Amino acid sequence: IADLKNRIETIQKFKSGNNSSSLINIISRYTKLANKGNLGKNIYACKDKINIKLFEKKSEIDVFRFLQSLENLVNTNNWEYSQLINSFEENIQVLIEIFDNENGVMVMTEDLNLRKNRLNLLAIVRNYSLLIADFTLLNF
């Protein structure tokens, strides 16, 4: 029960902040696209799921580095939901950039290897966000 209370308090505090609508929107976009892939919602490690050799743009590398930082965070003892949500807030531009017309990538590309790799990248972001809440269900 303490864990649930902690999550609720973190979400309430987050929703009262300035960036909440932007972050909810971008994580919802990640989630909707990630759901088109087949990576399970219980996968948090990039190893064997993401092939960095397939990255074509810096935006993919940046999201990958963000995931590495999240992995390091949740692998520490006593990490808190507030730390996780703060990391998402601090990296909102990284999350947005992957969809940018010039600097981003086409996730649903015809190349199936690239598509799977990109969907897995988005899915792992989704999975970390689900540790806090399903952002597609958060209302303003």
Cite the ranges covered by each PLM segment:
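Amphipathic alpha-helical "coupling" segments that flank catalytic cores
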Residues: I1-F140
